[in-house]
Amino acid sequence: MPSVMEKPSAGSGILSRSRAKTAPNGGQPHSEDDSSEEEHSHDSMIRVGTNYQAVIPECKPESPARYSNKELKGMLVWSPNHCVSDAKLDKYIAMAKEKHGYNIEQALGMLLWHKHDVEKSLADLANFTPFPDEWTVEDKVLFEQAFGFHGKCFQRIQQMLPDKLIPSLVKYYYSWKKTRSRTSVMDRQARRLGGRKDKEDSDELEEGRGAVSEGEPDTGDPKREPLPSRPLNARPGPGKKEIQVSQYRHHPLRTRRRPPKGMYLSPEGLTAVSGSPDLANLTLRGLDSQLISLKRQVQSMKQTNSSLRQALEGGIDPLRPPEANTKFNSRWTTDEQLLAVQAIRRYGKDFGAIAEVIGNKTLTQVKTFFVSYRRRFNLEEVLQEWEAEQDGAPTAPVPVEEARRGAPVPATALEEDDEVQITSVSTSVPRSVPPAPPPPPPPTSLSQPPPLLRPPLPTAPTLLRQPPPLQQGRFLQPRLAPNQPPPPLIRPALAASRHSARPGPQPPPTLVGAQLEPPAPSL
């Protein structure tokens, strides 16, 4: 066997095939590829020696210690344990998610860090802030702008969103990419119109080519097919495929019969918009001006509302009159009595309004005053004047006898009759009738308030003074003490004067044993 490879010496390391072929033992003729091999001899050299051979280490058996010393590439996030039940784990995850904003992976990682101790994990959740994985509207807008500038270079996108990690950016990109295929109706319509224009241009070009190739068409022949159909039929296969693609491209729009919400289409508007691009721009400018004017109106209305709101916050306290913090008192002073009579003259039996006018009297106290001082201040005539102003005609009182016979009696007359019956004393009690009082003063006109009778001054000491007539205790039968004089009685002789046909106000009643003074001037 001829020696092709010799043992290398210290100075020689490479043996070429050309030297082996020129050896005296190789008597084979040269093949046709010898010339090509000689040209590329540097590519076919055999490299022998330690410089060109790999050093193979000794075989070591596999052992667990071999992998224990290696650095772990990942981090263990969660490892289940039997000491934590599923219900307790779900409760812990829900609390971490709702209260601290952790997701499931972060909450389980915290629990694993504390060796499945739920209490320690819950206490330590507030000490860390989880990475936000939620995308706000601002983040989405920034991502779209950054993607428009930099494309899929997420390192540059992260420079515009420094609080987002690259995995989060990639994850949001694929979810955002799915929504890009959803185009609006207006965009689809624009694409359709653009496709139609391109198709018309191409048809015109093909029609011109067909006319040049075929010569002038015969316009008098009605059986000749139109020229645009021939280039379409004569187009090769790829052209027909393109037509089919454009035909079925907008197939989903066939099912949509109505425009989207808020868009109203009319033939006039479409004709005006599609007529010329300048007209469409003018229409948009007009709409923009209307929008700007509406925004100005909204801004002015907001300013007006804010000023009114500030005025309402002040309240009506500055407009209220100053009110003194008076306490309710059951005693009636002379000024309060006169004020009550004037209030009755103006408000009638509206005791609530009268109590508000006086200020320190309740509704019950005003009613008691009306019943108690009806005779003293001639409140019936005051009410008649008030009713005359309300109705426009005076109402004369009805006698008690007619009321007993069945005639309609006003409420004031019935109340007066009841008061006389309640305050009357049994006839078995002896009493002395004093002489008749002096004639009453002439009646006053209805336009002026009635004269006010001043109560007589007490002659006895304050402790021995008798109570005024017509108090609330009149509804009970008075018990006469053995050494106490009888109470003052109302003279019943006035009942006969009611039968007289003389119209006009009646004189005030007199009290037995009371000294009358000349009336005070009218208010």
UniProtKB/Swiss-Prot annotation:
<comment type="function">
    <text>May act as a component of a corepressor complex that represses transcription.</text>
</comment>
<feature type="domain" description="SANT 2">
    <location>
        <begin position="327"/>
        <end position="378"/>
    </location>
</feature>
<feature type="compositionally biased region" description="Low complexity">
    <location>
        <begin position="460"/>
        <end position="482"/>
    </location>
</feature>
<keyword id="KW-0804">Transcription</keyword>
<feature type="domain" description="ELM2">
    <location>
        <begin position="44"/>
        <end position="129"/>
    </location>
</feature>
<dbReference type="GO" id="GO:0003714">
    <property type="term" value="F:transcription corepressor activity"/>
</dbReference>
<dbReference type="GO" id="GO:0006357">
    <property type="term" value="P:regulation of transcription by RNA polymerase II"/>
</dbReference>
<dbReference type="InterPro" id="IPR051066">
    <property type="entry name" value="Trans_reg/Corepressor"/>
</dbReference>
<dbReference type="GO" id="GO:0005634">
    <property type="term" value="C:nucleus"/>
</dbReference>
<keyword id="KW-0678">Repressor</keyword>
<feature type="compositionally biased region" description="Basic and acidic residues">
    <location>
        <begin position="30"/>
        <end position="43"/>
    </location>
</feature>
<feature type="modified residue" description="Phosphoserine">
    <location>
        <position position="202"/>
    </location>
</feature>
<keyword id="KW-0175">Coiled coil</keyword>
<keyword id="KW-0832">Ubl conjugation</keyword>
<dbReference type="GO" id="GO:0000118">
    <property type="term" value="C:histone deacetylase complex"/>
</dbReference>
<comment type="similarity">
    <text>Belongs to the CoREST family.</text>
</comment>
<keyword id="KW-0539">Nucleus</keyword>
<feature type="region of interest" description="Disordered">
    <location>
        <begin position="185"/>
        <end position="265"/>
    </location>
</feature>
<keyword id="KW-0677">Repeat</keyword>
<dbReference type="InterPro" id="IPR009057">
    <property type="entry name" value="Homeodomain-like_sf"/>
</dbReference>
<dbReference type="GO" id="GO:0005667">
    <property type="term" value="C:transcription regulator complex"/>
</dbReference>
<feature type="modified residue" description="Phosphoserine">
    <location>
        <position position="63"/>
    </location>
</feature>
<dbReference type="GO" id="GO:0019899">
    <property type="term" value="F:enzyme binding"/>
</dbReference>
<feature type="modified residue" description="Phosphoserine">
    <location>
        <position position="31"/>
    </location>
</feature>
<dbReference type="GO" id="GO:0000785">
    <property type="term" value="C:chromatin"/>
</dbReference>
<dbReference type="GO" id="GO:0045892">
    <property type="term" value="P:negative regulation of DNA-templated transcription"/>
</dbReference>
<feature type="region of interest" description="Disordered">
    <location>
        <begin position="387"/>
        <end position="523"/>
    </location>
</feature>
<dbReference type="Pfam" id="PF20878">
    <property type="entry name" value="REST_helical"/>
</dbReference>
<keyword id="KW-0488">Methylation</keyword>
<dbReference type="InterPro" id="IPR001005">
    <property type="entry name" value="SANT/Myb"/>
</dbReference>
<feature type="modified residue" description="Phosphoserine">
    <location>
        <position position="35"/>
    </location>
</feature>
<feature type="domain" description="SANT 1">
    <location>
        <begin position="130"/>
        <end position="181"/>
    </location>
</feature>
<feature type="modified residue" description="Phosphoserine">
    <location>
        <position position="36"/>
    </location>
</feature>
<keyword id="KW-0597">Phosphoprotein</keyword>
<keyword id="KW-0805">Transcription regulation</keyword>
<dbReference type="InterPro" id="IPR017884">
    <property type="entry name" value="SANT_dom"/>
</dbReference>
<feature type="region of interest" description="Disordered">
    <location>
        <begin position="1"/>
        <end position="43"/>
    </location>
</feature>
<dbReference type="InterPro" id="IPR049048">
    <property type="entry name" value="REST_helical"/>
</dbReference>
<dbReference type="InterPro" id="IPR000949">
    <property type="entry name" value="ELM2_dom"/>
</dbReference>
<feature type="coiled-coil region">
    <location>
        <begin position="283"/>
        <end position="314"/>
    </location>
</feature>
<feature type="modified residue" description="Asymmetric dimethylarginine">
    <location>
        <position position="479"/>
    </location>
</feature>
<dbReference type="Pfam" id="PF01448">
    <property type="entry name" value="ELM2"/>
</dbReference>
